[in-house]
Amino acid sequence: MNCLKNCRSYQTKRPLWLYNTSLRFFFNTPMLADVIFKIQGSTVPAHRAVLVARCKVMAAMFNGNYLEASSVLVPVYGVSKETFLSFLEYLYTDSCCPASILQAMSLLICAEMYQVSRLQHICELYIITQLQSMPSRELATTSLSVVGLLKKAKFHNSDCLSTWLLHFIATNYLIFSQKPDFQDLSAEERSFVEMHRWPSNIYLKQLAEYRKYVHSRKCRCIVM
């Protein structure tokens, strides 16, 4: 009984943060942090144990013969602070909620940089889902460059996304062929799009002939 009382007494004196078992509680907080990332003039605290467990690149970086292994302050290049925070949030929480297609692409690039393939796939799925849900009118007027997304996806080895985007451009040929960035497609990409375009030239030709036929039937004078 005395042991139980002492245990309860100890629990009432413990700080509340010790009861929180979610890693989200430690995300972007200096509490128990043992590494600080310096990015775009700002600092972001983190915990090596979490990073090593969740990211192979960081595991090699902090355990190998690299400067980062013995440094508390680690600089980060080639990525914005917002994107890097989203990347760290995924490592801590195993969840990802991009605010836009462009943010998802930036996060995908960061995931490719640190070789976190699952996060890459999540970003790919987000981009595909968002583009699929866009009405044709919005696709025609948006300033978002789908061809630009295709180029980035190819450059960063996102084969699934780049293949889907190429089919998406071909399927919506009449919309994307009118955009200036359509000319940025490579010869190989243009050949693929022309071969798989919809509507196809054959379909458009048949449609024009049918409309011509219908118009001629309406205009014919029929004497009863």
Residue ranges and their predicted role:
Residues 1-4:
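Ankyrin repeat (ANK) tandem arrays and their immediately adjacent linkers/low-complexity segments
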Residues 12-30:
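Charged, flexible boundary elements
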Residues 16, 100-101, 143:
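A conditional alpha-helix N-cap/helix-loop micro-motif detector
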Residues 18-22, 57, 86, 202:
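Exposed alpha-helical structural elements
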Residues 24, 30-35, 74, 129-224:
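BTB/POZ-protein C-terminal extensions
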Residues 31-135, 139:
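Canonical BTB/POZ domain core
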